[in-house]
């Protein structure tokens, strides 16, 4: 299928938002705005929806700040459940643009894999990661691209993170049922 993408630098391009909002044929991936608040980015999504296209996926791709060093951006994946709670929109995480490099952590995992797991465990619905057969030859985003031979490893790691999320979700459901039983008055009281 086809999905339109509005990148971070166009999140406040209101003429573009109007045009894309009026075209209901394709869903839209709207990335969080560059240098604006979460609320301002969510308002851009609302602007799109008000023009008629409510098939919006909200993209988190990190925030530009010096607190992100040594990564390109400060990872904002703690906002995954916040966006879902406030809007009910599906959420896409973009670990490649958040991290911006292929650095490997001391445990052997790539930073982008750690960040991907964070977003998935937080409940992300979609992941956008850069892959390239020869990252050094890529015209854009080469330094952050994973290689094609790394794809099976990446997908297995994603499956592990997803299983952890599902376990956590089931635990929350069980606790909610337990709390509901405790809150119900007993017959004959």
Where are these regions (language model features)?
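Active-site beta->alpha loop and helix N-cap motifs at the rims of alpha/beta catalytic domains
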Residues: 1-17
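Catalytic alpha/beta core domains of metabolic enzymes, predominantly
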Residues: 12-131
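Flexible glycine/acidic-rich beta-alpha junction loops that bind and position SAM and/or redox cofactors
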Residues: 66-68, 101-103, 133-142, 171-182
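Short, electropositive alpha-helical surface patch
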Residues: 113-115, 143-156, 181-188
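C-terminal helical cap(s) of enzyme catalytic domains, especially alpha/beta-barrels
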Residues: 134-167
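Surface-exposed amphipathic alpha-helical tracts and adjacent flexible/coil segments at the periphery
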Residues: 155-189
């Amino acid at each position: 299928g086809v999905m339109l993408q509005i990148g971070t630098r166009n999140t406040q391009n209101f003429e573009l938002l109007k045009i894309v909002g009026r075209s209901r044929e394709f869903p839209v991936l709207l990335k969080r705005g560059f240098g604006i608040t979460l609320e301002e980015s969510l308002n851009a999504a609302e602007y799109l929806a008000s023009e008629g296209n409510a098939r919006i996926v909200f993209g988190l791709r990190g925030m530009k700040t010096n607190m992100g060093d040594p990564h390109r951006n400060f990872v904002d994946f703690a906002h995954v459940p916040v966006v879902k709670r406030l809007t009910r929109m599906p959420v896409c995480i973009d670990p490649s643009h958040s991290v911006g490099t292929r650095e490997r952590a001391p445990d052997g995992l790539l930073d982008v894999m750690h960040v991907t797991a964070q977003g998935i465990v937080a409940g992300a619905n979609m992941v956008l990661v850069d892959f390239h057969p020869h990252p050094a030859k890529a015209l854009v985003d080469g330094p952050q691209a994973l290689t094609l031979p790394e794809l099976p490893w990446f997908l297995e790691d994603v499956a592990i993170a997803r299983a952890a999320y599902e376990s956590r979700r089931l635990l929350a459901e069980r606790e909610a049922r337990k709390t509901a039983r405790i809150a119900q008055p007993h017959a004959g009281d």
